[in-house]
Amino acid sequence: MGLSDGEWQLVLNAWGKVEADIPGHGQEVLIRLFKGHPETLEKFDKFKHLKSEDEMKASEDLKKHGATVLTALGNILKKKGNHEAELKPLAQSHATKHKISVQFLEFISEAIIQVIQSKHPGDFGGDAQAAMGKALELFRNDMAAKYKELGFQG
């Protein structure tokens, strides 16, 4: 399920828009994730106390974590599928320490696409959305394979 060179170019063009404001995009992705799937908030001891969107928007820690998440994902996307070195430590921590299920990775993938679409509608049309969806699916599938190697049934 690889992506063509053209699809990777669409993904990386869209990601360039994200990188122009990683903290802002990351914060919005996490807020959208937590609002759409409140059960995901329980995985974040640091953010469990944030009950309203206003509290989430005011949290510098949430903004920082959003930036961390999107920076790591950006480093993976830039490898165009050749992301073994970047993926291994991420899968290790998410399987053994954080216990983040593949389903939660699907939820955050949806949030990422929704945020890019809402912030950059003119630059993130149907083809770019489909390409990003494929890239994030590749990421999730590879995370799931690593989880399996680690004995995590997430």
UniProtKB/Swiss-Prot annotation:
Nitrite binds at H65. One of its GO terms (cellular component) is extracellular exosome. The modification Phosphothreonine is found at T68. It is found in: Cytoplasm, Sarcoplasm. Its main location: cytoplasm. PROSITE patterns: GLOBIN. It catalyses: Fe(III)-heme b-[protein] + nitric oxide + H2O = Fe(II)-heme b-[protein] + nitrite + 2 H(+); H2O2 + AH2 = A + 2 H2O. The modification Phosphoserine is found at S4. One of its GO terms (biological process) is removal of superoxide radicals. GO terms for molecular function: heme binding; metal ion binding; nitrite reductase activity; oxygen binding; oxygen carrier activity; peroxidase activity. InterPro entries: Globin (IPR000971), Globin-like_sf (IPR009050), Myoglobin (IPR002335). PANTHER family: MYOGLOBIN (PTHR47132:SF1). Monomeric. Belongs to the globin family. This is Myoglobin. It comes from Didelphis virginiana (North American opossum). The gene is MB.
